[in-house]
Amino acid sequence: MDPCECSKSGTCNCGGSCTCTNCSCKSCKKSCCPCCPSGCTKCASGCVCKGKTCDTSCCQ
């Protein structure tokens, strides 16, 4: 099961770039959205969602 609740409260579009719309989850795991929001420290398993947007710097 996807640990991210974006599918219930918003949308996460992953690909070459990542966009989160109305994303209210506190963390974006790779299964939902591999991108780290601006100002988020890169990490292995995911990163903290800050705000409602993601930039193109992604966690690997």
Swiss-Prot record:
Amino-acid positions noted as binding a divalent metal cation 6 in the UniProt annotation, renumbered to this chain: C36, C40, C43, C59
Amino acids binding a divalent metal cation 2: C6, C12, C14, C25
Transmembrane segments: none
Superkingdom, natural source: Eukaryota
Positions with a binding annotation for a divalent metal cation 4: C32, C33, C43, C47
Alpha: region residues: 29-60
Chain positions covered by the region annotation Beta: 1-28
Binding of a divalent metal cation 1, residues: C4, C6, C20, C23
Coiled coil: none
Annotated residues for binding of a divalent metal cation 3: C14, C18, C23, C28
Keywords in alphabetical order: Metal-binding, Metal-thiolate cluster
Keyword Transcription attached: no
A Pfam family the protein falls into: Metallothio
Binding sites annotated in the UniProt record for a divalent metal cation 5: C33, C35, C36, C49
Residue sites binding a divalent metal cation 7 per the record: C49, C54, C58, C59
Gene3D superfamilies tied to this protein: Metallothionein Isoform II
SUPFAM superfamilies documented for this protein: Metallothionein
GO molecular-function terms, A-Z: metal ion binding
Its biological purpose: Metallothioneins have a high content of cysteine residues that bind various heavy metals.
Listed name of the protein: Metallothionein A
Gene: mta
